[in-house]
Amino acid sequence: MSETRIVNVASYNRIESLVKSLESIIDQCDVINVTLNSHDGDIPEILYHDKINLMLSDNSLGDAMKFYMLDKSDGYYLTIDDDLIYPPNYVEYMIAKCKEYGNTRVMTLHGRNFASFPITSYYRSATERYACLNAVKKNVIVQFGGTGVMCFHTDLLKLGIDYFMAPNMADVWIGRYCLDNKIEILCLRHESGFIKYIPQKTTIYDQESNNDGLQTEIANAIYQHKPLPIISREKAIPVVSKLERTPSTINYEKVNQIFNGQTHVGKTRQVNNNINERPTGNAQMIQKLMGKRRGR
C-alpha cells in the first residue's frame, strides 16, 4: 500500500488565495496536482515548485477537477479548496485517521445529513450540518462529505473524471459513489479554528445555494434509488495539457514570455503531455503549446 501523500486542488480566479492555501500545505505532502480552470493570467512562482503538477483546463467541470488525477494515483489522496488555510499537522492528522480505521472510510472535516428523502433543497434542507471552520465535537458519519477537507486511500476509492457528470457538486458525486459502494464518510472531530478561511467575494455556495435544483434532484435520486436525471453536456470532458482541446485557456503572451526565458524558466519541470499518463510538471507542456502555436 503506497504511502505517497497526494494533494489535489482545482482553482478558478483565486490565484492569491490559492497561493496561500498551497503555502500552508506544500511541506506536508509529496505531490500537489493543481488545476487552473479558465486561467489566462500570470503563473505565480509557487506553481513552479518541484512537487507541483500544473494543469490548465476550462471550467466545465469546476471543482470536480480536483479528482482529475484520482484514477492515475496511488497513495493517500487529499482534496483541498483554494480558500482554506490548513494547519501544519493537517495531512498527518487526516492520514492517521484513515489508518486508524484501516483505510476503510473516507475522512472529511465537513458534511451534512438529511433525515429523510425527498428533500426540497440540497443546501437548505439538511438536518445536520458539520462545518470545517467550526468545532465538531465527535466523529460522525455523514451522507455527503466536504471535498475541500477530504482524505482517503486510493485502494479504497478510485474513479475516473467521467463519474462527475455535472460541475461544482463534487460532494454530491462522492456521496453517491460511497453509498453505492458501501463506504462510510466520516466527519472527524476537530476544534474551531483548525481550518481557517480566506474571505472571498463569491463562492460555489453563493452561486449554487439558491439554484440547487440539480443537486437536490441528484441527491433525491441517490437516496430514493431512482435513475439519475438526464444531464446534458455541451462540452467534452476538459483535457489538460493539450492545446487542441483547450485553446481558450492559454495566454499566449505569457507562454511566449516563459518560452523566451523571461519568467521562471529555471523553475519548471518536465511534463508528460500524454493525458493518459500522470503529468509531472510544466516545461514540456509549455514547449508543446508553443510548438503547436508555431505550427510545428
Question: Model-flagged regions — what are they?
Answer:
Residues 87, 93-159:
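Conserved catalytic core of nucleotide-sugar-dependent glycosyltransferases
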Residues 37-73:
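Active-site-proximal specificity loops/subdomain of glycosyltransferases
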Residues 9-11, 36-38, 189:
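Short beta-strand/turn micro-motifs composed of small residues
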Residues 20-24, 66-69, 92-94:
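A short acidic, amphipathic alpha-helical/loop segment
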Residues 75-85:
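Short beta-strand-to-loop acidic/aromatic patch adjacent to the donor-nucleotide binding site
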Residues 11-27:
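Short, well-formed alpha-helical segments that are part of the catalytic scaffolds
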Residues 163-279, 283-296:
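C-terminal catalytic/acceptor-binding lobe
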Residues 3-5, 25-34, 52, 75:
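Short loop->beta transition adjacent to catalytic acidic/histidine clusters or analogous donor-positioning motifs
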